[in-house]
Regions:
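Bacterial Sec-dependent N-terminal signal peptides
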Residues: 1-20
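Histidine-centered catalytic micro-motifs
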Residues: 266
Length: 510
């Protein structure tokens, strides 16, 4: 029997109709959007290479001695792109990589740093990019550091010494060592991940069951807080789903770490939830995968809400989706999926407070033939959210035609959210048309006490052919198309959304 998908605050389960309406209710605030939902993630992933190695860190991002490198050896083109996107935070150094990582290998004179075998991905790690380099990169971007601790093969002493190195002013062995290496001022790293994918027993080094993980995480948090009481923690939620134990893992983590950690993480890559027989089907990709992504968020929220009811005296956990990515497709289909992930974060602004897109380098495209970097439609779609949707998120629902995909019914073709700018002066309504072939005409209205004011509204749209390949040669065509649309006297906007497109309306707030 199929599950009936209820997109809470998104759609009404109606029969297919000819008329589609997007209703925004600015009287119903979902929550304040945390800018950290637009964070990114990086880890060095190589494949059985001997030095000199090249992976998504060494080569593209860290490229000393090349024309694009800044004084610290990082690609200035990426730094400029991340600054334009206003990237708020970067999670590093892993990922699976961190389960075999010793942070002390990555400090001190570079010619004295050891080369290690990468236990997670194969190949070798030269440790030329370590703590001081990552911090310098984030300083150049203007982003926060989110350090993921090694609670796989690592130990708690190593974790607390890492915090001592980054956060203590002076007077201890590791804080003085940091100063000796040229960094007298502490980095004051605020966010610390309590391990990575420790539930993933088929792949992770140092796998633990949920009970053992909670015990280690509690002690690690206790140790780091003794070093710096201002730090915040991200508990390791589910990343392994096939055996069906993910919900039980999350339940135990929520029960054990509520009041200790500040966030619980989940990892979800867009195509991972699809059966291989449907993985290449268009509507499975934009429908079933989207519903699965929403379902994972709502399932964890339900567990957190239960714990809140049982222990109202404890600080509730918030969600960090600190690995996500719309992989498994190319071109505009990939962009649609990424935008749907971001729409989900906005839609659940009361609960999703942190995110980390995987990998950060995917936000700036590179042409395989020419080696040139350029801004693809995905860059511009990300920018629509990260620079605009920063205020409050509002209840938004769609009535209109729907479709079925996998075990899910009543998925609306239009996926819509509404959020204000950081200053509250503009309401951004972001709409994704998931229909493979058809444009959809819809009315947009504010059903709150203040209807949209009559006048012209700016519109930005991203679209493209499903078979189109993004290239450097076509880079000038990828910026959003800009237009205006009229708000009628009755406060409605009528607009026709192109098939497989992303559209954002910038509506002045009265």
């Amino acid at each position: 029997m199929k599950k009936l998908l209820s997109f809470i605050c998104l759609c009404l389960p109606l029969l297919a109709t000819a008329q589609t309406t997007i209703s925004v209710n600015t009287d119903r605030v979902i929550g304040k959007i945390d800018k950290n939902i637009y964070g990114v993630f990086m880890e060095p992933i190589g494949r059985d290479q001997e030095p000199p190695i090249e992976n998504n860190v060494y080569g593209p991002l860290y490229c000393p001695g090349t024309p694009n490198a800044n004084a610290d050896g990082f690609n200035q083109l990426y730094i400029d792109a991340f600054r334009e996107l206003q990237i708020p935070a970067m999670r590093w150094p892993g990922g699976n990589y961190v389960a075999g990582y010793n942070w002390e290998d990555g400090i001190g004179p570079k010619d004295q740093r050891p080369v290690r075998k990468d236990l997670a991905w194969g190949g070798y790690e030269t440790n030329q990019v370590g703590t001081d380099e990552w911090v310098a990169l984030n300083k150049a971007i203007g982003s926060e550091n989110i350090i993921c601790l090694n609670l796989g093969l690592g130990d708690i002493n190593s974790a607390r010494f890492w915090c001592e190195y980054t956060n203590v002013d002076h007077g201890t062995y590791y804080s003085d060592l940091r100063a000796k290496y040229g960094h007298p001022e502490p980095y004051k790293v605020k966010y610390w991940g309590l391990g990575n994918e420790v539930d993933g027993y088929p792949w992770i080094m140092g796998h633990k069951n949920a009970d053992d993980y909670v015990k280690v995480a509690i002690e690690a948090a206790k140790a780091l807080r003794a070093v710096d009481r201002s730090v915040q923690f991200v508990a390791n939620g589910s990343a392994y789903y096939p055996d069906g134990t993910w919900a039980e893992w999350n339940r135990k983590v929520v029960e054990g770490l509520t009041g200790i950690a500040h966030y619980i993480s989940i990892h979800r890559y867009w195509r991972d939830g699809l059966d291989e027989s449907r993985a290449d089907d268009y509507y499975s990709y934009v429908g079933e995968a989207a519903a699965d992504f929403e379902e994972k968020i709502m399932s964890v929220k339900a567990q957190v809400d239960i714990q809140k009811a049982l222990h109202p005296e404890k600080r509730s956990l918030m969600l960090s989706v600190d690995e996500w990515g719309a992989h498994g497709a190319a071109g505009i289909k990939n962009v649609l999926a990424g935008a749907m992930c971001l729409n989900s974060f906005v839609r659940h602004a009361d609960f999703v407070k942190m995110g980390a897109y995987t990998m950060a380098t995917g936000l700036l495209a590179s042409d395989r033939e020419s080696g040139q970097y350029y801004k693809s439609p995905w860059f511009y779609a990300y920018k629509m959210f990260s620079t605009n949707c920063l205020g409050e998120s509002f209840d938004t629902y769609v009535s209109g035609d729907t479709f079925s995909s996998g075990p899910y019914d009543n998925i609306p073709y239009l996926d819509a959210t509404a959020a204000t700018s950081e200053d509250g002066k503009t309401l951004f309504v972001t709409v994704i048309n998931r229909h493979e072939k058809d444009a959809i005409k819809a009315d947009i209205q504010n059903v709150g006490k203040n209807a949209f004011a009559a006048g012209r509204v700016n519109v930005s749209s991203i679209e493209g052919g499903l078979d189109d390949t993004f290239t450097y040669a076509k880079r000038d065509s990828y910026a959003p198309k800009e237009s205006t649309v009229n708000v009628a006297r009755d406060g409605k906007i009528t607009y026709t959304f192109p098939a497989h497109s992303i559209t954002q309306f910038a509506i002045p707030v009265k």
